Amino acid sequence: MQLLVYGYGNPGRQDDGLGIELVNKLEDWAAENGLDNIEFENNYQLNIEDAEAISNKDLVIFADASKEDIEDFYLSKIDGSGKLSFTTHAASPAYVLELCKELFQKEPLVLLLHIKGYEWEFKEEISPGAQKNLDRAVEYLKPILEDPSLPLGSPGQFKSC
């Protein structure tokens, strides 16, 4: 099974860099554990080119910082929107998935990991509270990445706060 973990955000805006930091931590862990079926990417934002990057994967986990009212993190399944309209400079995970389906006739399982952030100033450091949330999210994802055959769509598999 081919996996992609893709973090996005701005590491120069404190907790907005949570997705990128998640990728850094998991990439080191995967290398130490010989997990060579996982690809890691990060960027400031998702782009239309990412539709190709996900087209040859079975499972894609996008990770981003969140201002949502959640405890620490939340993993949700992304469905294609059913329509293509590109009106901003950045693409959403649903848009990237829909574009992948349209252009490559592929539909990987796509999840979005929302990691709770608190500080958004122009600094290159993650706040202590967000760091705890990040550490919890990393530990939650490790067994999923080790055994992606886990029933990801079943109740109880997704972390909800």
Task: Please report, for each region that a protein language model flagged, where it lies by residue.
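N-terminal catalytic or cofactor-binding beta/alpha core of small enzyme domains
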Residues: M1-I115, E124-R136, L141-S149, F158-C161
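Acidic/polar active-site rim loop that often engages polyanionic ligands
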Residues: Y118
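Glycine-rich phosphate/diphosphate-binding loops and the adjacent beta-loop-alpha structural elements
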Residues: E121
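A cross-taxon signal for low-complexity, glycine/charged-rich
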Residues: G153-P155
